[in-house]
Amino acid sequence: MLGLGTLARKIFGTPNDRKVKSVRSLVARINELETEFQALSDEGIKQKTAEFQRRVQEGGESLDDLLPEAFANCREGARRALGLRAFDVQLMGGIFLHQGNIAEMKTGEGKTLVATFPAYLNALAGKGVHVVTVNDYLAKRDSEWMGKVYAQLGLTTGVVYPFQSEEEKKAAYRADITYATNNELGFDYLRDNMKASKEEMKQRGHFFAIVDEVDSILIDEARTPLIISGPSQDRSDLYTKVDKLIPELVEEHYKLDEKTRNVTFTEEGNEFLETRLHETGLLPEGQSLYDPESTTIVHHVNQGLRAHKLFHRDQQYIVRNDEIMLIDEFTGRMMRGRRLSDGLHQAIEAKEGVSIQPENVTLASVTFQNYFRLYDKLGGMTGTAATEAEEFMEIYGLGVVEVPTNRPVARTDEHDAVYRTAREKNDGIVASIKEAHERGQPILVGTTSIDKSEALSELLKAAGIPHNVLNARQHEQEAQIVADAGKPGAVTIATNMAGRGTDIQLGGNVEMKVMQALAADPTAHPDEIRARIEAEHAEEKQKVIDAGGLFVLGTERHESRRIDNQLRGRSGRQGDPGRSAFFLSLEDDLMRIFGSDRLDKVLSTLGMKDGEAIVHPWVNKSLEKAQAKVEARNFDIRKQLLKFDDVMNDQRKAIFSQRLEIMEAEDLSDIAQDMRYQVIDDLIDMHMPPKSYSDQWDIEGMHRAVMDKLGLDAPLAKWAQEEGVDQDVVRERLCEAADRQIADKTAAFGPETMRSIEKQILLQAIDAKWREHLLTLEHLRSVVGFRGYAQRDPLSEYKTEAFALFESMLNSLRQDVTQKLAQVRPLSEEEQQAVMRQFLDQQRTAAEAPASVPQPQAAVAPQPAPELVGADNGESQPQAWGDVARNDPCPCGSGLKYKHCHGRLD
């Protein structure tokens, strides 16, 4: 008997069925227009684009109303440029993307072509469209390939990648459609908000983004902050000394939690550490680990412990050319230029004995969650999103629609085979691979880490089975290995989803074979080469089909069902036959850490002998329940982190918005004046409290503060003795005196120069104070969790204190700007030019430095913003400066190096 839910679905269809049905009329309308657009000349297609742009930008026609015509024009453009006619299901995918959904489309269904339809339609608005991919190779490949379609339609295409010149990057963002990686988009956003002028900014807004492999970017990497950072002091000797202590620890000294990937010292461990740190001199005698002064050394020791117990060579990182290269846990690729933050990368460098690079301090940061929520509209594509539908809707407001396949999926998904030990499992894997290889069936073997892929490779070598290994070490050969993976009998071992974004075609990749043949014999006729290779390919493809298609063999289950489904999805593309199976053992990480008692009972009920695998639907269900629990826990973590990050995000948006207004403004004298007046108000409130009498005022303290903050030697003691002088009178006189001082400086500098100095001082102060604020918030966030022990909500505490810190930062900003403007003095024209050049160069260096994405947090490299122009910070007392390095900024505040200023050798 059918359940009520099943019966209702049979009668009314699922919500997904209804969504698909709702766009069929639009697809029918596009098909009706096909002959009309086929009749157009090439020039006629471009004229249609120009007509559409006028209708949208000048006539106010909505993109929804224009959709059928625009899609019909795009389909014809793609047919002429690439020889590809989009299927109805591809049009559906394009419609769902335009509507701000995630289109779940299986591997091989042509997602790259699907993106051209909503990209073309939305580009007609003239605000730019970003197509987001997971790596630079795919961004360049797709922009070149689909750029032919956009050129046919009369639109421009750009591609953004690291280390481009300023002009190239700016031109790419000015194109109608821009291809880029999620990392580069996020970093350019941060860099733009560190620029000295609006003209230097590259991005022109966030109108519409289409995110390819959306699950990887918005779910897997959601917790990853993008951080641009600058160098701090070198502590490499401290890391080395701490690293020597870690191997002395025994198991009783620390507690390792593999579920949460966390490790902490026990009470015994703390006692042992304190003793050893005293003996090595790292902790002064009489000082305890629990003293506030010990915070730094305790932090270093904790990072050393994490480096040894949580980060393992050939799993989370590899060592190459005296460097620690991080491995992306989701794709298995090397992450060049990325560094772990908070001293963790240095701890791993000390552990491996490679050169220790200096730590970095955060200059700017944003998470992918908050970056992509900047867009007015967002769409996404992936082969697997349904399992995370709730998260996409709750965090990003994105619905998930499963788009029907053009042909039915012919892949057979077998039940998991569970062995008792890893050795028995590996024997089963090798036997299964050997049997498929001998039948001529290509096999893709999925592993979870580099060391496991290489261990399996050794087993296959011992068994005499030829194979390729695709992991971070073979990153450069990825395209070739993937192209060969569909050949008869090919065996390919891949870490996680390495090679994702490139289809494995049965019989091998025709285009790759043609290119290689033409490269080998440039004199050959391309048509003859293609005809010969296509004939050979058809024969090889048939052999593979007869052998059962691509066999995907998973060697472990992942924490997420979605990652497992991605691996399965490499087989059975476009209706091809295929087969998938997972081989597991009770020693696998997931089974060991999350395997429930229920699974143990199931296996004992079914009976298990040595060397024998259990294959049963009960096992699958039990595993999926364990995975669902892990997914729910990870979702909760991401949700909670987002709530914390939203606090910083609101502040970030306020600061970046204010900074942009300052960059755009011609005259900032009113803002500077408001800041001066606020500083005067604050000083009066502090030293001359309301409702107090003049004999209660702190005249001496007020005089010192006015000299320090405003540079004014005001006769406050005399004013206080005058009849009828109250706080309002003092305020008025100080404001007038401060205004006269600035007016005199404006006359000395010239109005234009003074306006430029005001802008420069404001931007520098905002950048410096924001950097300090980020560091303070990081520290607050690292300790606020302990408030839970006092029955206080950490999030509420964080919000309250972060707001108070933000207000404090704004007060400090006002004081800093007011003080610098009061102290600024006229420089010679030559000095002014030198200072301005140095400021702009350092701004550019800071904004264009290679940045990085961390594993909890990380980044690389720009210099901190320079000290300010011409501020008079006690120039009259060089004897009080102490020893100044010749390359350091001169303490007089000129902005010049000491050797070019007061340290000049005459």
From Swiss-Prot:
May bind 1 zinc ion per subunit. Pfam families: P-loop_SecA, SEC-C, SecA_DEAD, SecA_PP_bind, SecA_SW. The keyword Metal-binding applies. It catalyses: ATP + H2O + cellular proteinSide 1 = ADP + phosphate + cellular proteinSide 2. Its EC number is 7.4.2.8. It comes from the Bacteria. GO terms for molecular function: ATP binding; metal ion binding; protein-exporting ATPase activity. One of its GO terms (biological process) is protein transport by the Sec complex. Its cofactor is Zn(2+). Coiled coil: none annotated. GO terms for cellular component: cell envelope Sec protein transport complex; cytosol; plasma membrane. Residues 845-882 are annotated as: Disordered. Monomer and homodimer. Part of the essential Sec protein translocation apparatus which comprises SecA, SecYEG and auxiliary proteins SecDF-YajC and YidC. Belongs to the SecA family. This is Protein translocase subunit SecA. It comes from Cereibacter sphaeroides (strain ATCC 17025 / ATH 2.4.3) (Rhodobacter sphaeroides). The gene is secA.
